[in-house]
Amino acid sequence: MSIADLKSRLIKASTSKMTAEL
C-alpha cells in the first residue's frame, strides 16, 4: 500500500462522512 493510496482512502472517507452529515 502506498501513501497516496492511504490519502485517497482518507479523503473518500471524510467526504462520505461530510455528505452523510448534511
Curated annotation (Swiss-Prot):
Source domain of life: Viruses
Q: Which GO terms describe its biological process?
A: DNA recombination; DNA repair; DNA replication
**Which Gene Ontology MF annotations are present?**
ATP binding
Which keywords annotate this record?
A: ATP-binding, DNA damage, DNA recombination, DNA repair, DNA replication, Nucleotide-binding
**What is the stated purpose of this protein?**
Important in genetic recombination, DNA repair, and replication. Possesses pairing and strand-transfer activity. Interacts with dda and gene 32 proteins.
Q: Which family does it belong to?
A: Belongs to the RecA family.
Spell out the protein name for this chain. Recombination and repair protein
Q: What organism is recorded for this protein?
A: Enterobacteria phage T2
Q: What is the lineage of its organism?
A: Viruses, Duplodnaviria, Heunggongvirae, Uroviricota, Caudoviricetes
